[in-house]
Amino acid sequence: MKRYVFMLSDGTGITAETLGNSLITQFENIQFEKITIPYIDSTHRAESVVLRINQCFSEQGTKPLVFMTLVDPEIRQAIKKAHACVFDLFSIFIGPLENELEEKSSYTVGRTHGVANVKSYSHRIEAIDFALSHDDGIKTRGYDKADIILIGVSRCGKTPSCLYMALQYGILAANYPFTEEDLVGFRLPDVLRPYKQKLFGLTIDAQRLQQIRSERRPNSKYASAEQCRLEVTEVEAMYQRENIPYINSTKYSIEEISTKVLAIAGLQRKI
């Protein structure tokens, strides 16, 4: 079975996508054709979107699902005229909030992802710059400023996790990869020892690590099953010996890895 899913927003569409995807992934036997339409900022544009939704209804014979985060009441009403099952994610929550807070919403578009909060925006940029300049052990001098330092073998998810934490949470995240040389008589590298309280380890199943590395450098010692097993075994033993917290990243998305790391490390959002 196939169903069309529209994610509609008067901003970037990130919130509608996030909430919509979280819900539809619970239905594994249905194939979803996802369409995101951001910046619906007028009733004229909303009407053109309605035509597109109705066309999908005519072609498929089933109502498209519509997840929308639209602030303007007139634009929301225009979308609700579509032949679709509409989930108005804004009004679901804003009414009860107005009642509880005893204050009317300002109905301002773009509050979530805008740059109105200059301090927050500047901190996000600083965090991204920090993650990029302290990626892959390139620069260790700034580790004293880091909120967290991810460590682990090559290709276990350190870099994307650091970038995600920087972008979404404003966390100053560095990462350090263990090389083949580090694994000889393996112990915690001296450069990391002064920052031991900031260290958080990632590990990964050896079979999955081999698959990832084979895509990058096929038929190499680096990607061999034996090498992957050795590195994973040694690094996990070191984590336990040094009492460094760690998680296995094999079955988790970058978003899940990042949130688990922050929760275990006790770090809070900065933006």
From Swiss-Prot:
Enzyme Commission designation: 2.7.11.33, 2.7.4.28
Any Pfam family matching the protein: Kinase-PPPase
InterPro entries in the cross-refs: Kinase-pyrophosphorylase, PSRP
GO MF term set: ADP binding; ATP binding; phosphotransferase activity, phosphate group as acceptor; protein serine/threonine kinase activity
Sites where the protein binds ADP: G152, V153, S154, R155, C156, G157, K158, T159
Keyword annotations: Kinase, Nucleotide-binding, Serine/threonine-protein kinase, Transferase
UniProt catalytic activity: [pyruvate, water dikinase] + ADP = [pyruvate, water dikinase]-phosphate + AMP + H(+); [pyruvate, water dikinase]-phosphate + phosphate + H(+) = [pyruvate, water dikinase] + diphosphate
Task of the protein: Bifunctional serine/threonine kinase and phosphorylase involved in the regulation of the phosphoenolpyruvate synthase (PEPS) by catalyzing its phosphorylation/dephosphorylation.
UniProt record similarity statement: Belongs to the pyruvate, phosphate/water dikinase regulatory protein family. PSRP subfamily.
Protein name: Putative phosphoenolpyruvate synthase regulatory protein
Protein source organism: Legionella pneumophila (strain Lens)
